[in-house]
């Protein structure tokens, strides 16, 4: 089964290529923190030889509480992203929440992301597809992996085949998510690159009443399980002070653990992809 290769700059994203790290922070808390986080990701990924894309949100439009921090907004967010790109020369990915944002974001960011909660919103999907940008499609917590085919088709019929799929866990009762490892294989049958968002798979949605809880202590275990499935890359959030992060701190890796964390996953990715394919169907 041929696997499609999606290219951004010199980076090749494919299920049979070395893993790409889509890493950064959950939301742009400040310009200075974004620069700090990106600088550390660049240092670590360059040292380890891992292709890297910086990620962060300019607006968290789906927070549990109306009082929760959402981000700097579209205009200021794009200014911060532009500075990061100039300073570190890295590709950028961020999420889009409304159709009118798609073209604006695509002018700055190399990859635009369709949020999980919005992944069936046809007007948004089509607006994003028509930009021609690479789209990272998050699998909704309420969708089966085979249902992602419909979203891919919407994008393709709008003229865009620069697509990536991303697993971020499935609802399991209230305030809990689980990751079905068999789902990766189902999505890989569509031949597009598949990523694993380990950070958000550790969420406990609404687990702290007005915000999401999480299981940071298990991030390496779950990341290893995902990377063992021959994936195109890992989606990961880190923070210099997760306990005081403005969003999803309980799921975020401590920034000072990034190097040993990624070193283990790079070794695992190389090992898994060195094995010959065994047809078991």
UniProtKB/Swiss-Prot annotation:
Reaction(s) this enzyme catalyzes, per UniProt: D-arabinose 5-phosphate + phosphoenolpyruvate + H2O = 3-deoxy-alpha-D-manno-2-octulosonate-8-phosphate + phosphate
GO BP term, pick one: keto-3-deoxy-D-manno-octulosonic acid biosynthetic process
Alphabetically ordered keywords of this record: Cytoplasm, Lipopolysaccharide biosynthesis, Transferase
Pathway in which this enzyme or protein is active: Carbohydrate biosynthesis; 3-deoxy-D-manno-octulosonate biosynthesis; 3-deoxy-D-manno-octulosonate from D-ribulose 5-phosphate: step 2/3; Bacterial outer membrane biogenesis; lipopolysaccharide biosynthesis
Gene Ontology cellular component list: cytoplasm
An MF annotation (GO) of this entry: 3-deoxy-8-phosphooctulonate synthase activity
Pfam families to which the protein is assigned, alphabetical: DAHP_synth_1
NCBIfam families, alphabetized: KDO8P_synth (TIGR01362), PRK05198.1 (NF003543), PRK12457.1 (NF009109)
Protein name: 2-dehydro-3-deoxyphosphooctonate aldolase
Gene behind the chain: kdsA
């Amino acid at each position: 089964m041929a696997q499609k290769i999606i290219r951004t700059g010199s980076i090749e994203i494919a299920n049979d290529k070395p893993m790409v790290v889509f890493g950064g922070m959950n939301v742009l808390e400040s310009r200075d923190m974004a620069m700090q986080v990106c600088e550390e990701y660049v240092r670590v990924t360059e040292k380890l030889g891992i292709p890297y894309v910086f990620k962060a949100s300019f607006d968290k439009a789906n927070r549990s509480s109306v009082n929760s921090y959402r981000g700097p907004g579209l205009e200021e967010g794009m200014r911060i992203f532009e500075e990061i790109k100039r300073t570190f020369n890295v590709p950028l990915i961020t999420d889009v929440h409304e159709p009118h944002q798609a073209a604006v974001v695509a002018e700055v960011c190399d990859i635009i992301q369709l949020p999980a909660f919005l992944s069936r919103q046809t007007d948004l999907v089509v607006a994003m597809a028509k930009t021609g940008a690479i789209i990272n499609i998050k699998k909704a917590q309420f969708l089966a992996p085979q249902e992602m085919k419909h979203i891919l088709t919407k994008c393709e019929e709008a003229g865009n085949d620069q697509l990536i799929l991303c697993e971020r866990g499935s609802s399991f009762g209230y305030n809990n998510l689980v990751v079905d490892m068999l789902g990766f294989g189902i999505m890989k049958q569509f031949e597009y690159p598949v990523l694993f968002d380990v950070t958000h798979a550790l969420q406990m949605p609404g687990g702290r009443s007005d915000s999401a809880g999480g299981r940071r202590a298990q991030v390496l275990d779950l990341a290893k399980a995902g990377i063992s499935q021959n994936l195109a890359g890992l989606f990961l959030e880190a923070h210099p002070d997760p306990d005081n992060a403005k969003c999803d701190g309980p799921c975020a890796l401590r920034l000072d653990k990034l190097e040993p964390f990624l070193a283990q996953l790079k070794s695992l990715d190389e090992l898994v992809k060195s094995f010959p394919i065994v047809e078991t169907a």
